[in-house]
UniProtKB/Swiss-Prot annotation:
Keyword Membrane: yes
Name of this chain's protein: Disulfide bond formation protein B
Periplasmic side: 30-47, 88-143
Lineage of the organism: Bacteria, Pseudomonadati, Pseudomonadota, Betaproteobacteria, Burkholderiales
Listed GO biological process terms: protein folding
Residue ranges annotated as Cytoplasmic topological domain: 1-12, 64-69, 163-167
Length: 167
């Protein structure tokens, strides 16, 4: 089935956008129904997922090959960024900092500090980022987020390679 979707890149990109919307909806369910509060790194991953959904959706409506390749390239970069943040959070969960502090929340960091100071603070993580509140099949939300971003990145890379070979 996946190989059939590769022959229809616009359909595959629409499926990626729809999958991202479903993941975002599940994140909101975990936050507002289950009661899990997202940490700063979770929020950055959500923003990356929103951008992936927008780029995948816009690229899906593109009809020319150059636009599909360019959109898939941007998708690859965004998925790589999301995977990096998820991998960093997974690392913090596996090897929590010795001094776990709650730290500031995401918006507090952005509002209080200049951007060049706030961004490193976000990636440093806090006690909240190292905490595992929910698991599925032994993986935390950050672990599954990494898997999703990796699949999106591999899909974009495969699309680029396939489209570049077509005449």
């Amino acid at each position: 089935m996946f190989l059939n979707l590769l022959d229809a890149p616009r359909r595959l990109l629409a499926l990626v956008a729809l999958g991202c919307v479903a993941l975002l909806a599940f994140g909101l369910y975990l936050q507002h129904v289950v009661g899990l509060e997202p940490c700063p790194m979770c929020i950055v991953q959500r923003y990356a997922l929103v951008l992936v959904a927008i780029v995948a959706g816009l690229t899906a409506i593109t009809s020319n090959k150059k636009g599909l390749i360019t959109g898939s390239g941007v998708l690859l970069l965004l998925a790589g960024f999301g995977a990096f943040v998820a991998a960093r959070q997974s690392f913090l969960q596996w090897y929590p900092p010795e001094v776990a502090s709650c730290g500031r929340d995401f918006y507090g960091m952005i509002e209080t500090f200049p951007l060049q100071r706030a961004i490193p603070m976000i990636f440093k993580g806090s006690g909240d980022c190292a905490k595992v509140d929910w698991t599925f099949l032994g993986g935390s939300i950050a672990n599954w987020s990494f898997v999703c971003f990796a699949v999106i990145g591999l899909t974009a890379l495969t699309l680029i390679a396939r489209l570049a070979r077509q005449r």
